[in-house]
Amino acid sequence: MNAIGIKIKKADGNHDPGASKFFGAPVLPDGWAELFSEDIIFFGQIRLSDIAELDTENKLPHTGYLYLFLDVEMYPYQAMAFYYDGEPNVVVVDFNKAEVQFAHLNEDWLMSFEPVDEDFDGTRLFGVPSSGYETDEELLLQFDPLAESTGFLDNIDGYAYFFFGEDEDRIDGIRFGIDRS
């Protein structure tokens, strides 16, 4: 089983707004920004061409963008995932500002990718959950809140997970979970 490690670093200065990243300003297709209420936060965008060579099992499309959002109105948070097969063109500055608890998540944290073992302890795509989190669901993304100082869920000593949906459209049914080790 292949897994893709994600290294993150806070963007400094000029960078491509369409880059793969956590938090900050998403670059969305025209008309999408109006679809989100103030209870929705932007978690991340992955430019799928960035991982195409590393996704040897073709778990995701290799063109376009995968977007991850969280509905934080109630706990546990609900995942919202969208795939767009094109080039988005609208930068949405301060997307997370309206949600007071997450207003600080308006800086871009850029992603870089590398192959890792399926049980790598850290932020990654695919593989198996690191902490012994028991599930039959297939892992899309494991996020380590303590790996960097993003300020997201940094009060837990564990992981945040996004799991693929079980239906034919595996992106539409993505589920979010937290493991407090």
Predicted segments with their positions:
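Preference for intrinsically disordered or flexible, low-complexity segments
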Residues: M1-S181
